[in-house]
């Protein structure tokens, strides 16, 4: 019995992008473009008429903003959406907002030589469309989350950090598709005195700083884009810069950030496998590994290495994942100690830390 191809509707105000995406998608045997629309108002009618499986949506468009349309779509007719974004600071902020509103993932448009650049992205585009077609679509919460800069006692008196012994705990996290929202949910629950956290989220370099700044505005801990050589402090999370590997390193008794321009691993740079291996090598049983929603198997091998080195490891459960790919692979390879729903993970994490003799944390 033949499988029906994935039906894709392209929504983009650029005729060139619509044409290029159509050629890329129609070159695949398992998907087809059933329609195109130059703006959301036309798209609204074509969704009703064509009933597509997946939508590609430009962020910035005339007549109706892409985000306004996405918010209405997710409220009235939730469906998988793949955002198509430019590599600019403004677009990165808007794209992250789109992920908050329920988009499954995004791809970026090249800045120059669009025709050749889009062809180079062809595999990424088609892979992400396949994943989006199977992804769990989540309606965003109706309550708007206001973003206010947090104030702490640091505004009056800076915190003094002691020198840590080699038993200092460290948390390393890997995520991909659906990970921006999973990470936000997890990090918002982190207490201000949590162990240091290193994060590899598959994301282009124009987006990671904006992503870290967004998280920092929401969390009790401090969140920033990682810088080579900086000391890793409790109550801080460090996000891998796009196109650079993030590794855990040591300087005496302290953990520090190491960034590498080494080749892609598991097709990714930054790679979760690279981060997890560095944690296995340099922290061993003092590390906790967490693998979250994402397609593919990046992190599965590294998580097994962490567990074999004595680290404790968590995987996000299938029900709470947008895409149960990376966690599924890590579980299958025997690298996972505990599988947990995303909402339960902070409590279970700190319950385990306290069972190992660490002080109590207020989660």
Swiss-Prot record:
Modification 4-aspartylphosphate occurs at: 58
PTM description: Phosphorylated by CheA. Phosphorylation of the N-terminal regulatory domain activates the methylesterase activity.
Pfam families per UniProt: CheB_methylest, Response_reg
GO MF annotations in UniProt: phosphorelay response regulator activity; protein-glutamate methylesterase activity; protein-glutamine glutaminase activity
EC number annotated for this UniProt entry: 3.1.1.61, 3.5.1.44
Keywords per UniProt: Chemotaxis, Cytoplasm, Hydrolase, Phosphoprotein
CDD domains attached to this UniProt entry: CheB_Rec, REC_CheB-like
Location in or out of the cell: Cytoplasm
Example of a GO biological process term: chemotaxis
UniProt domain CheB-type methylesterase: residue ranges: 164-356
GO cellular component: cytoplasm
Reaction catalyzed: [protein]-L-glutamate 5-O-methyl ester + H2O = L-glutamyl-[protein] + methanol + H(+); L-glutaminyl-[protein] + H2O = L-glutamyl-[protein] + NH4(+)
Active site feature: 176, 202, 298
Domain of life: Bacteria
UniProt keyword Disulfide bond, yes or no: no
Domain spans labelled Response regulatory: 7-124
Listed InterPro entries: CheB-like (IPR008248), CheB_C (IPR035909), CheY-like_superfamily (IPR011006), Sig_transdc_resp-reg_Me-estase (IPR000673), Sig_transdc_resp-reg_receiver (IPR001789)
Role: Involved in chemotaxis. Part of a chemotaxis signal transduction system that modulates chemotaxis in response to various stimuli. Catalyzes the demethylation of specific methylglutamate residues introduced into the chemoreceptors (methyl-accepting chemotaxis proteins or MCP) by CheR. Also mediates the irreversible deamidation of specific glutamine residues to glutamic acid.
Record's comment describing the protein's domains: Contains a C-terminal catalytic domain, and an N-terminal region which modulates catalytic activity.
Family: Belongs to the CheB family.
The name this protein goes by in its record: Protein-glutamate methylesterase/protein-glutamine glutaminase 1
Gene: cheB1
């Amino acid at each position: 019995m033949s499988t029906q191809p994935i039906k894709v509707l392209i929504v983009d105000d650029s005729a060139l992008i619509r044409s290029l995406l159509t050629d890329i998608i129609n070159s695949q045997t398992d998907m087809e473009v059933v329609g195109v629309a130059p703006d959301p108002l036309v798209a609204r009618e074509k969704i009703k008429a064509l009933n597509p499986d997946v939508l590609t949506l430009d962020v910035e468009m005339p007549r109706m903003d892409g985000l306004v349309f996405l918010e209405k779509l997710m409220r009235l007719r939730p469906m998988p959406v793949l955002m198509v974004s430019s590599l600019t600071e403004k677009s990165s902020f808007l794209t992250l907002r789109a992920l908050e509103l329920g988009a499954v993932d995004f791809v970026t448009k090249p800045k120059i030589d669009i025709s050749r650049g889009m062809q180079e992205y062809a595999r990424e585009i088609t892979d992400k469309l396949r994943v989006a077609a199977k992804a769990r679509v989540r309606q965003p919460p109706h309550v708007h989350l206001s973003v206010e800069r947090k104030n702490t006692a640091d505004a009056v008196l800076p915190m003094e950090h002691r020198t840590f012994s080699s038993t200092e705990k460290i948390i390393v996290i890997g995520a991909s598709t659906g990970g921006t929202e999973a990470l936000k949910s997890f990090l918002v629950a982190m207490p201000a005195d949590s162990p240091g956290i290193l994060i590899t989220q598959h994301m282009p370099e124009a987006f990671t700083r904006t992503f870290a700044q967004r998280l920092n505005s929401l969390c009790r801990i401090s969140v920033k884009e990682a810088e080579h050589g900086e000391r890793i402090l409790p109550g801080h999370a460090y996000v891998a810069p796009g196109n650079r590997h993030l590794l855990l390193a040591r300087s005496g008794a302290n953990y520090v950030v190491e960034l590498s321009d080494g080749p892609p691993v598991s097709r990714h740079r930054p790679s979760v496998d690279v981060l997890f291996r560095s944690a296995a090598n340099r922290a061993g049983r003092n590390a906790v590994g967490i693998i979250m929603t994402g397609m593919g198997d990046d992190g599965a091998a590294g998580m097994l290495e962490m567990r074999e080195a004595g680290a404790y490891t968590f995987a996000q459960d299938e029900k709470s994942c947008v895409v149960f790919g990376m966690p599924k692979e890590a579980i299958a390879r025997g690298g996972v100690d505990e599988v947990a729903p995303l909402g339960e993970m902070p409590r279970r994490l700190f319950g385990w830390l306290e069972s190992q003799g660490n002080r109590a944390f207020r989660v």
